Design a protein with these regions (language model features):
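C-terminal outer-membrane/trafficking sorting elements
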Residues: 2-76
């Protein structure tokens, strides 16, 4: 659980365009903290959810043919 911000860590194995989208429990996209070309390496991005209500959120990382979705819990 986090309040009001969380850090998302991720690794990129091949250079390319990377997008991280954050969705609420209804599937509505509420934020896109990463949307850029990145080189190989380890990265972090912070998401401040102070403008959003408590609840379950999901982040989806997309890079090339790779896609991963993880759950986050915002407790205020």
């Amino acid at each position: 659980p986090f309040n009001p911000s969380t850090r998302i860590a991720f690794d990129i194995s091949k250079p390319g365009f990377v997008r991280i989208s954050i969705f609420n429990s209804l599937g509505r996209e509420v934020s896109v903290p990463v949307n850029e070309y990145l080189n190989t390496g380890s990265y972090t991005t912070d998401w401040n959810a102070s403008a959003h209500p408590s609840g379950v959120y999901f982040y989806k990382l997309e890079s090339g043919n790779y896609s991963e979705t993880k759950k986050m819990l915002l407790l205020k």
